[in-house]
Amino acid sequence: MDTTTTMAPLPLLTTTSLLLFFFLASSFAADVVVAGGGGGGGGYDGGGDGEGGGGGDGEGGGGGGGAKMPHVNHGRYKCGPWVDGHATFYGGRDASGTTEGGACGYKDADGYGAMTAAVSPALFDNGAGCGACYELKGDSGKTVVVTATNQAPPPVNGMKGEHFDLTMPAFLSIAEEKLGVVPVSYRKVACVRQGGIKYTITGNPSYNMVMVKNVGGAGDVVKLTVKGTKRVKWTPLQRSWGQLWKTEANLTGESLTFRVMTGDHRKATSWRVAPRDWTYDNTYQAKKNF
């Protein structure tokens, strides 16, 4: 809990201290957005390995030729039930101090804005909960939808349910600043994003890091695989921390396709989202999302 709040001091482990630590760890990531190249650019996936928007696995990736992979209609994400929790806030009235990193590895430029939250360890789930969206309702009946972008301290003593440490703009949407800590009802809801899924690739040919962001639907990525157009077959990545995924496979020199699975076990495949001449420290955006 930030010292600007009026509630009694929390233990030394605060969202702010966690934020500073993970900001240092994530400072290497770049955010130069490059348009998704070649192929079909992305879309829902039914689990098959056929190419979308190009002919077979050959290099090039033009948008014509070849049979396109059919899109599967997964329907809308089903909201979870309302449960009890509580909310505090950290950072300034303009959300300053909340966007420079965090335990998910997101940065301010990643487009999540001021309506974000650090969530308690159970919801954070060692990074698997990053990117999920929650609707919170205060005693006044007002609601706000936030994205999980950081890890909060454990639940506050004497309060029910899980802890949401909100940015101040999000907190003020449902409660008065002077209250400091308030009971809320919350539920997991669909994430509505602008544009396609984004993949930031950093590292080197021996150790690749991929940040996944701007994911719609369930929002939380639980599995990520990559496929090239020549030597790289479908290869699972391992979670490094937050929404940063790693692989030691050499991905250079090939168009890259990423397949994302979210917490509700739905999949989306971004076909050839990174062109053959992709470079490190750039972000590649698919044409579609969940």
Swiss-Prot record:
InterPro entries linked to this entry: Expan_Lol_pI, Expansin, Expansin/allergen_DPBB_dom, Expansin_CBD, Expansin_CBD_sf, RlpA-like_DPBB, RlpA-like_sf
Expansin-like CBD domain segment(s): 206-286
Residue ranges the record marks as coiled coil: none
Stored CDD domains: DPBB_EXPA_N (cd22274)
Membrane topology: Peripheral membrane protein
Every Expansin-like EG45 domain range: 101-196
Subcellular location as annotated: Secreted, Cell wall; Membrane
Region (Disordered): 45-67
Signal peptide: 1-29
Principal location: secreted
Function: May cause loosening and extension of plant cell walls by disrupting non-covalent bonding between cellulose microfibrils and matrix glucans. No enzymatic activity has been found. May be required for rapid internodal elongation in deepwater rice during submergence.
Similarity remark: Belongs to the expansin family. Expansin A subfamily.
Name of the protein: Expansin-A26
Native source organism of the sequence: Oryza sativa subsp. japonica (Rice)
